[in-house]
Amino acid sequence: MSQYAAELCKLLITDNFGELYALIFIYLLNHGRQPLPRIVQNTHLSPRQVRHGLAVLVQQHLVFHCTSLDDGITYYESNWRSAYNLVRSGKIIQLVEERLGNRAASIVSTLLALGHAKISYLESLPELQPGHERPVKANGINGVHGGEGEDVNGVDNDAENHTDHAHDYQQDGPVREPNGYHDSDPGLQVQTILQQLAAFGFITRVRNQHFQSPEDNFDAALKAAKSNGDSYGLKGNKLEAKLTEDAEKLVKEWTDGRISRALPSASLLRGVKRRLRKDDSSAPRKRLKLDGPLEDDVKDEDDGDDFSDDDYHNDEMAALDPNMVIRVNYEKFNVALRNRRLIELADQNGSAVTSQVYETLLSHIEVQTPTCREHVEAIPEGEEAEQYSVSIRLDTISRDLDIDLDLAGVIAGIIPDNINGIKEDEDDEDEEGGPVSMKRRGPSRNYLVDQHLSFLAAEPSFFCTRRMQAGMITWAVEYRHLAKKLRHLELERLIEARFGGFAVRIVRVLAAKGKLDEKRLQEISLMASKDLRQILGQMASAGFVELQEVPRDAQRQPSRTMYLWFYDPDRVRFMVIEDTYKSMSRCLQRIRVEREKLKFLLEKTERSDVKGNEDRYLSAAELQTLKEWRDTEKLLLGEVARLDELVAVLRDY
């Protein structure tokens, strides 16, 4: 754990929960696994305060705990990744609001504040009931108020779950809704919204193994694998490989928090997208089939329908257990945010229509992709194996696209009048009500969709891959290649901003050719020797390129030594991540300093009689100062959100 990452986690926990919890967390982060008496001794806190703080940190999944079977002592360990995820709370709330509406965002905001909660408790909260609208604050950083941590988690704690007040980063009111968007059904019950969130995978069931560190879970699984007898007769490396494989399967099974595999994820996805496209509460609801092994196998009962009126209805779903304990699934949100980034990249490389086709493909893949990577720790570049997503049938993608989308208008050689390959004056049914045969004047809709995806699959992008399965055209995505492409684009953007376009050329040459001496590098990059040396010196001093000395003989004389330049993308990536942690910490520290300068004014604006009536109770000078402060805070928080995007690309995707 680096210095700046620890500093950032401490600032985030302090701003969200208070200094008591940050003190306990940073002690565990610096000293590793510790029992309760040692925490009390070294933090100079009372046992009651430590138990109180650990109870809240455990409920927020910021601290792991494990009781040893040998001595019965409970050890606590910090979870720094969960602490860092606090910075993405605003993005998570905004994403849920865009897809499922304000009430779903309110539920997710409540879960983020509580850490985890029973479904029955969420259903009992007045602010989450139909007809009660509260502003959902999301700024890309936090957007969550820490409240009173009540006994709602179903886990026995030694102390009452009470949290300090948490400062909300957002000061500008609720987030604006997207154009043309309205909540599809403001009367939906909490149970229905939770089913929608579960279908997207945005919430997950809390299991006992989620409170233990991955190392403890693996050790327990390894002991179970040794005792089951499946490895009888194996020795040496084969025995070790077999035990490791069985242990990983057990850990995956123990930590699988999917609420239900029978939820109609594909049908729900189509229903939500259509509700976002048009607010039609009177549309007939059709019974949706449950998912099979592949989500693209889900079809309507009447194959002739185009799903345009499909909607989600709670009666078709199994009700969630009221005693189930749930929490926010950060890993699934990372998948959704990665897909959003890929859609933006596809939009830059193609047309808006092509990016919409790609968005539809990724939306079907997303519901079946639980995590961005199988292993949390980053694998060195060049050692990662290919990771293909599930394959989605071409006709499924075509059926889910907007029927009014002009697929032919941006493809050369296709007559724009034949949009989707169907005559404009043709009806779906004849006068007797029976289906008629389509007289196509142009390419079919499936062909046009296939052309858009083929454009994305071509070099050098490789956004998707075409496959044939059982005689059907399917499309998949190779995520590891795209994640590598995103990382390289971000690093090249940083290098160009700091050293210019010629530096990007040098980096690309070194990445493609490996180690090169200055003369050979000059020949390939087509640069003057003076300019090349100047740029190499600047990049070497900043740590972006390195120089290796290879002596020609044992004397090691400078005249008999080769100097080879090389570029290590993994080292540069980790260096940039550390610098980003430092920049984020400095932004949050600056916010605290500026807030301290205006302490009395901000305390005045937080009064219940002043909040919302600033024009009445504040003077003109105070209003101007408050406006300047909010602009400054918005600027700094926006910078933190932008830096978090960089960390996500370089570390998580």
Swiss-Prot record:
May I have one GO cellular component term?
A: RNA polymerase III complex
Subcellular localization, as worded in the UniProt entry: Nucleus
Segments for region (Leucine-zipper): 580-601
Give the matching InterPro entries.
POLR3C_WHD, RNA_pol_III_RPC82-rel_HTH, RNA_pol_III_Rpc82_C, RPC3, WH-like_DNA-bd_sf
Return the Pfam families for the record. HTH_9, POLR3C_WHD, RNA_pol_Rpc82
Task: Could you list this entry's UniProt keywords, alphabetically sorted.
Answer: DNA-directed RNA polymerase, Nucleus, Transcription, Zinc
Biased segments, Basic and acidic residues type: 159-170
Q: Where is this region: Disordered?
A: 141-186, 280-309, 422-442
Annotated GO MF terms: single-stranded DNA binding
Comp. bias regions, Acidic residues: 293-309, 424-433
Write down the superkingdom of origin: Eukaryota
Query: Would you kindly state one Gene Ontology biological process term found in this protein's UniProt entry?
Result: DNA-templated transcription
The family this protein is said to belong to: Belongs to the RNA polymerase beta chain family.
Q: How does it assemble?
A: Component of the RNA polymerase III (Pol III) complex consisting of 17 subunits.
Q: Per its database record, what is this protein's job?
A: DNA-dependent RNA polymerase catalyzes the transcription of DNA into RNA using the four ribonucleoside triphosphates as substrates. Specific core component of RNA polymerase III which synthesizes small RNAs, such as 5S rRNA and tRNAs.
State the protein's name: DNA-directed RNA polymerase III subunit RPC-3
Q: Which organism is it from?
A: Coccidioides immitis (strain RS)
> Gene behind this chain?
RPC-82
